[in-house]
Amino acid sequence: MEKLLHVGLDVGSTTVKIVIMDENLNTIYTDYQRHFSDTKNTVCNVLTDLAKKYEDYEFTIALTGSGAMSAANFLDLPFIQEVVSCKRAVEKYIPQTDVVIELGGEDAKIIYFDKSIEQRMNGTCAGGTGAFIDQMASLLHTDPTGLNELAKNHKMIYPIASRCGVFAKTDVQPLLNEGAAKEDIAASIFQAVVNQTISGLACGRPIRGNVAFLGGPLNYLSELRNRFIETLKLEGDAIIIPEEAHLLVAKGAALDSVESSHAITSQKLKSKIEMLRSCMAISNSAEKSREWKNAYQNLIWVMIKKLEMDDSQG
């Protein structure tokens, strides 16, 4: 019998995360990369690397995240709701958690762990998320990491709207024109994210107890975390910053794959990937799409007529 690995993919709004665990559920490999809106191709590339790297293994695989459903359907692999994967990982790695605050590329969530789990998520607007931070950083001619470094030396906080990047820009640009310190503006941008998350998602429900910070922005931007910690008045053990916080949901998917997925060989995985790539080639090429339609339209028409005859009565 071939050795078995458990794989979780978190396909988010801007990134793909993969976690690979051995049979003892120890993490042996992780990867984190932007997909630039090309989710299926990025998932194919990540899984192709997996099949090559561990050619002599079998895999259980589960996909989760806002961009995972279509890829999971094409690959005929289990799709796990993100809140389920998050719950699974939280219960295993940080069971003392009462509330999760998670920021992604274009989404923000607060998850309350009580007698029942309640998730609150932003709508179509990406205000107060990683994309918002990217946009605001560009106004200061830097990137999110540079924004974080600037915020470490701030002295005051200015009010900045974060519901929409357009509104925020109208607040930030006058501050720049008036000569406000970039350090203060950077910290104010992070505070705007905090305000948007708490007011827009918590909607008056208290954030109490042990709070875990998940997602790429909160994993990499220490000053953003600090704005949350200060605003929520968190201290000591109430502050939970798990190791590899940006990968926790992918870890949950890997754990879920143990029960939700049948093991497949690397060769079978390669076949699934090739099938997805061929479907993508047809959908991306007008010529190939026409060829496919011409090849199958007669067959489809015959099937339709046959169904009509089979369903007829009298």
Where are the predicted features?
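Glycine-rich phosphate-binding/hydrolytic loop that grips phosphoryl groups
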Residues: 133-135, 241-279
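Short glycine-rich, Thr/Ser-proximal phosphate-binding strand/loop in the N-terminal lobe
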Residues: 5-41, 45-48, 119, 123
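Flexible inter-domain linker/hinge segments
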Residues: 1, 260-314
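Adenine-nucleotide phosphate-binding core of ATP-dependent small-molecule kinases
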Residues: 168-199
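Phosphate/ATP-binding catalytic cores across multiple sugar-kinase/actin-like superfamilies
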Residues: 188-207, 253, 299-306
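Glycine-rich phosphate-binding loops at beta-strand->alpha-helix junctions
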Residues: 67, 203-231, 242-249
